[in-house]
Regions:
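Surface-exposed binding/hinge segments that line
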Residues: 116-118, 123-192
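Short, well-ordered beta-strand elements
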Residues: 29-41, 89-93, 117-120, 166-167, ...
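Gly/Pro-rich hinge or "lid" segments in bacterial periplasmic/extracellular proteins
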Residues: 155, 163-164, 169-242, 249
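Bacterial signal peptide processing site
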Residues: 24-26
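Aromatic- and charge-enriched surface segment that lines or borders ligand/interaction sites
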Residues: 79-136, 253-257
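Bacterial N-terminal signal peptides that target proteins for export
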Residues: 1-9
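N-terminal lobe/hinge region of extracytoplasmic solute-binding protein
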Residues: 35-85, 209-210
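C-terminal motif of bacterial Sec signal peptides marking the signal peptidase cleavage site
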Residues: 19-22
Length: 259
């Protein structure tokens, strides 16, 4: 992932932090339409890099940490974290009882556990994934050897202790590591669900699970329509529609497309 792309992701995340926390207060502000160059096509967070895909992933997936409206890193799916004195070990304690959300807000039996993050990072460093996020997390122990196929994925410096404790071991200090955990590539991935999609993970509404504030309500040729998991005075309905084909559509037409 190059510097430009990384900055794009940061800017998009900041923009949405402002949008989703700064627009509340009235029912008129509970829906937002974002016109993008292309309708999102790939919502696999370990490979998503196009701007419209990153925008969607930033809202569909919750990770270990997130940035609040002030730009500070705060816990998201974890209760807290600890960093060793030498800066080489990061330990996260996940919240209990969390589950993924399916299409149209359907409840699922897929629990969010530490193993989901382990699997996500093994995917990042799987040569077959060709994840652009591998370079961002190159400080993780044995990441280079796993990526080039000379080491077993089980030796990667990401491990689970029980269901709710996740440990990262770095080969060198990286003071930006926490910040990088907000990138799409660091979002959790349930291995059983991933395998069940048979190569279509993140390519359709039925092959995508949400761990974040929004879930997929509909995904059509007209756009990607997201609804917030829990109603709030903030933006509750987010529409990502193509700029070139939808700029002349009325609000009523967009709502009709959403359904």
């Amino acid at each position: 992932m190059n510097r430009f792309l990384r900055m794009t992701a940061v800017v998009l995340a900041a923009a949405f932090a402002f949008l989703l926390t700064g627009c509340g207060g009235s029912s008129a502000s509970t829906s937002f339409t974002w016109f993008v160059d292309n309708i999102p096509a790939n919502l696999d967070p370990q490979v998503a890099t196009k701007a419209e895909d990153v925008i969607a992933c930033e809202n569909l997936y919750g990770g270990l940490v997130r940035r609040n409206a002030s730009g500070e890193l705060v816990p998201d799916l974890c209760e807290r974290w600890e960093i060793s004195s030498d800066g080489l070990t990061y330990t996260f304690y996940l919240k209990s009882g969390l589950t993924y959300t399916g299409t149209k807000g359907a409840a699922t039996d897929y629990a969010i556990t530490a193993e989901d993050f382990v699997y996500a990072f093994r995917r990042v460093f799987d040569p077959q994934t060709a994840s652009p996020y591998a370079v961002e997390f190159s400080a993780i122990q044995n990441s280079a050897a796993v990526l080039d196929g000379t080491a077993d994925p089980g030796t990667l410096g990401v491990s689970a202790i029980g269901e709710l404790t996740l440990v990262f071991r770095l080969s060198e200090r990286d003071d930006t590591f926490l910040s990088k955990l907000t990138l799409p590539g660091a979002m959790p991935c349930d291995e059983a669900f991933f395998e069940s999609t048979r190569g279509t993970y993140g390519l359709s509404s039925t092959s995508t699970l949400s761990s974040g504030s929004f879930y997929i309500y509909n995904w059509t040729a007209s756009g990607l329509f997201l609804h917030r998991s829990a109603a709030s005075p903030l933006v509750n309905n987010l529409r990502l529609v193509q700029n070139t084909s939808n700029t002349d559509k009325s609000a009523a037409q967009l709502i009709a497309d959403e359904k």
